[in-house]
Amino acid sequence: GNNGGDGLVIARVLSEKDWQADVVFVLGEKLSPLAQLNRERLNHSDGVSFIRPDELEGRLKTGYDLVIEGIFGTGFSGALPEKAAAVCRLLNQADGFKIALDIPTGLNCDTGEADKDTFRADLTYAFAAYKPAHMTDAGKAYCGETVCLDIGIE
């Protein structure tokens, strides 16, 4: 979805700043049109690698300084699909500073209800406005510090 598109934009910006970014499409490579556009922009970026979900565990063992999670966004509700839950479990055990985009995957942005495998962020960037879940006890536990970013939406 567009949360993944946001992650792709961040990967591009990081690569432009000479960071190496590894991108994993957890739920497959069927992307929204906007996310697909951002994926195509990365095709010629030397600083971005696309890795398969089955490669992630090994890569995490080598260590990352920063983990940015953008699997699901504000549209999530219910239980996490097993592929996403498995990745969240790996990420939650990994080293590195963890950032969630808008809302951690597994956290319902309206109710604050959290899947047992919800991504645990050190920092969450809320786009445009805080969501109700950011103010709940579960939201505070899974979001870490939450910072609202003005993205030009009024």
Regions found by a protein language model. Give the residues of each.
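Nucleotide and nucleotide-moiety/phosphate-recognizing core
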Residues: N2-I71, A79-L101
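YjeF_N-associated NAD(P)HX repair module
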Residues: Y64-E154
